[in-house]
């Protein structure tokens, strides 16, 4: 199946491109659960080259539906059948008539709506925040806690929720705020969760980037049991489990989770690679602790980049190191 995917992907840029053969390959990949993600990736690439599919727009639209990328039905196609419109109505979110779920978002939303505890491992582009907003949009939950890793993200989340739900919920985002409403959403870092004594009778709590509950391994091979942020997050989790009826943990690249069942907290674990963007991944094979090789690769990558480029770093310290190296190499200067 990988060979079919690679051939179709490379053919998209070829002069003798056949849109029918490309969509035939997409259909074959989408029809097999093992290769479903590859088929969806090809659909995203096809939508980025719409002009090459002008002769088979209807087939492309049907493949978009088959891939579960329902938001693109509304965004990319003007000629929609009554059946297409019914699909859009079914997957429309409770908080906005203009926002449509894709199939994985709807699946997670449906699990949470039914009262199940959910642990979700998914890429950033899956749109996990829209699921929380949809639960709020239903209006059935009164008290929620959203635990986010940074103050900056708490402020960003607070602004979004204030704009959408400020008329219905009190949005609490810092330690000194007094809760004066029966309907409240706490948007806090783990430290601020632990500082408050009014977090009780919670309908649902959400922890973003829950993988940070685990202590990290040092370069020496030892486990860093002194990381205060990890300790604070575990204390916050313990506190919230005792006062909440339901939980939703989200994060990327987690294959399994242990311990919650033994503690008496049944949950549904969902691990998905559902991406709404197409990615071309190049692997350099650099060891995790080989900083010299990483900086060398950084120079090679920066030299090859001609458009605006985003570099993701795991910490402010690493971001500073990368910035200094780029400046030394002459990038980002007039």
Question: Where are the regions a protein language model picked out?
Answer:
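N-terminal helicase ATP-binding lobe
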Residues: 1-334
